[in-house]
Amino acid sequence: MSKKIQAIRGMNDLLPKNSALWLSLEKTIFDLFITYGYQNIRTPIVEKTDTFCRAIGGDTDIVEKEMYSWKETSGESLSLRPEGTAGCVRMMIEHNLPRESIQKVFYQGAMFRHERPQKGRYRQFHQVGLEIFGVFNAKADAELMIIMHALWQTIGLKNIVLEINTLGSNEVRNAYRKILVAYFNQHKNQLNEDGLKQLKTNPFRILDSKNKAIHSLISDAPKLMDYLDKKSIQHFKQFKSYLDALNITYVINTSLVRGLDYYNRTVFEWTTTDLGTQSTICAGGRYDGLIEKMGGTPTPAVGLAIGLERLVLLLEAQNLISTKSTLSIYLIAFGKKEQIKSIQIANVLHDELPNVILYNDLTLGSFKSQFEKADKAKANFALILGEQELNNNQISIKPLRNQGTQQTMNLEEAIKYFKENQ
């Protein structure tokens, strides 16, 4: 017996019954971004591995353990993208876009990481991202928060907290890194295997550790805030003043460092307690040195990404999945002439009722079987074309969800009827 074919663990199918929610959510997000002046971009899901090594850092867990990478016959190493910013930056450099003007862009698509699959964490996951290139002012950082705040209000999200922090300039961060390493080296005996590795590769990640045994050690660690330069302090102060002006509530979390090496100054996360350990819904920050690091002209930048799977899980947890459905019609016809006429009627209805879902039965089955399919499709109305209707140049409308009694009328009247009942 052949082995049952199935998807790769941690890479999930989006089934037809769930796709309407995703399409509606994505449209809501994209429409909002566009109203704030952001333009859509698309980058390949495969990049040169070096692109991610240079952006994320070659000694990070993402690059060392989590990326899906392989070598071409030419010997060049390629990788599936584990996140979206590196590809956006590569695109900006390659096409000299920041030189033209300030770039405000958004992207969407699948990302890939070889992780242990669990609820809210998958090997293939989907993100929507916002990026601003060419603006150093904290007003750009604040605009991203304003957009997210507007999105949460639009979709009705509750119990979500904005956490913010500043990592200072790259120079301050590098100096603080040495101080942090010296501190944790004095307490190496309290660190587990992961902590010891992070001490060598990225000591900032220790500050974000979920290991409860070292929480007191972390709370006693030197604070980055005590080493900030004046420009970083002023930038963070401006950022907070914009949030205060719009009554956007936030919490300053000095342990918030973000998992990617390229961040500096402002970092932020929108978190919730409704999803257990996978609490981050949206996160990002400023990465002013990344374009230069990857070979481009020095360009300030700030961005964020939303995890769509987690956002959907949160909507479900908060019972915010809308039950409102688009008006749907199931066109039922019986007989060869009626089937041909039904195709013509369907064409007219699609033109006249562009926002209505129209199912035109393709099975050529009995009236009974077609009605059963209409019921299974959860259509609001059955549009019936039988011999009598065809001869009289009419069509019958049968409500399927207790909206009234069956009526017979001409097509023009039927179109008017549906427009009034949308």
Swiss-Prot record:
Enzyme class: ligase
Localization in the cell: Cytoplasm
InterPro entries in the record: aa-tRNA-synth_II, aa-tRNA-synth_II/BPL/LPL, Anticodon-bd, Anticodon-bd_dom_sf, His-tRNA-ligase, HisRS-like_core, HisRS/HisZ
Top-level division of the source organism's lineage: Bacteria
One record GO biological process: histidyl-tRNA aminoacylation
Chief subcellular location: cytoplasm
Family affiliation: Belongs to the class-II aminoacyl-tRNA synthetase family.
Keywords recorded for this protein, A-Z: Aminoacyl-tRNA synthetase, ATP-binding, Cytoplasm, Ligase, Nucleotide-binding, Protein biosynthesis
Keyword Cytoplasm: yes
Xref: HAMAP family: His_tRNA_synth (MF_00127)
This protein's name: Histidine--tRNA ligase
Tagged with keyword DNA repair: no
Gene Ontology molecular-function annotations: ATP binding; histidine-tRNA ligase activity
GO cellular component terms attached to this protein's record: cytoplasm
EC number: 6.1.1.21
Subunit text: Homodimer.
Lineage: Bacteria, Pseudomonadati, Pseudomonadota, Gammaproteobacteria, Candidatus Pseudothioglobaceae
Alphabetized CDD domains for the sequence: HisRS-like_core
Reactions catalysed, as given in the entry: tRNA(His) + L-histidine + ATP = L-histidyl-tRNA(His) + AMP + diphosphate + H(+)
